[in-house]
Every structure is written in C-alpha cells, then in structure tokens.
Amino acid sequence: MISQNNSIGTIKEIDGLRGVAMFIIVMSHFDAHFLQSGGVNIFFVVSGFFITKIISNKGIDFSIGNFYISRANSLYPQLLFTTILVFILYLIFGELEKINYFFNSFLAAISSTMNLYLIKQGNVYSNQEYINLFLPLWAFSVIFQFYIFYPIALKIIFSFNRFFKLSPVRIFYILIISTVISYIAYMYYFEKGNDVSNFYSPFSRLWQFLLGG
C-alpha cells in the first residue's frame, strides 16, 4: 500500500503485519463484515512506527523539509500515475454526464484530501448516485496528512529535549499519554454518532499512528 524508507532496514515482523493487513483488506472487499477497516488500521499503526523510527534516528538534526521532499518523491509518482490513468480511462469509458462528480473526486485524490472530501459529502461511502473510483485513496490521504503534522510535533519535542534533557523513557511516556488522549477523544466522537467524521478524520485516526510510534 505505502512504501517506507528502506534506510531503517527490513523488519520481518513488520513485513508480516503488512501481509496480514493486505489479506484483511482483500477479504473485506468480499465480505464487508470481515474485520471491517482492520487492515487499514494496521497500516496506520505500521506507518506510525516507521515514521517515528526514521525521525528518532536523526533526533534534533532531523530536517522537516528533507523529510517532506523524500516522502513526496516516494509517494507522489505512484499517486499521480494511478490517478491520471484512471482519469484517462474514465474519459474513454465513463459516464461523462457525471464528469463533475468525477473531477471533484479526482482533485481530492491528487491533493491527498480525499478523506476530507468524503466528510464534506456526508456519507461514509460517498455519493450513492456516483461510484467514486478514488474512494480507496482516503487512507492514503490520512497517512499523508499525518506525514505533514507528525514530524513537526516530534521536532518540537526534540527541541524541548535540548533544554529539559528528557530521557527516552519520558519521551515514551509522552507518546503513551498522547495516544491515550487521542483514543479517548476518538471514543467520545464515536459515542456521539459522528460516523463520517469518525471514519475519515485524521484526528480520529491519530491514536493508531501514535500507537505505532
């Protein structure tokens, strides 16, 4: 689903988790009740682990700008190729009377805001009158948004660490507390019945990334 930086090496257990996640995702497309979203959740946790590992290895010397460039170079060529190919195929074989719906979803896909677009639509599965060919990219959008803001948060922690000399254990506690707070917030919105926002919002998925971190 998402390629990771190979500079931290290959971890067999993580590769195994990816395999399990892919299996769950494939099976859920045949049976919607089969561990619903479980595979995507695993990918979020794995992404949180890898990004935390990449950043923590460099510590205070970590460059946010270089990280953004490396992530864009790694992810966007695949995204652009896929979305442009689908765009061309739709112009040839698609329902042109619904081109407005398609174009809006295309813009959301290439801008990595598909999840926000779906929240605006107000339905977990988007517009029921139009099959959104880019719907699976909502998870990519959540991951990309996490890549934007999470490095900034870690950079701030590392900067504070220069003055307060936080031990690795205390930094670990900070991540644990942040994960718990994020999960409590997620459960609060879940109980309030905000199904669409709860499903697609990067904030409701934050605890999964932090759990991996």
Where in this protein do the model-derived segments appear?
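Membrane-interface helix/loop caps of multi-pass membrane proteins
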Residues: 1-213
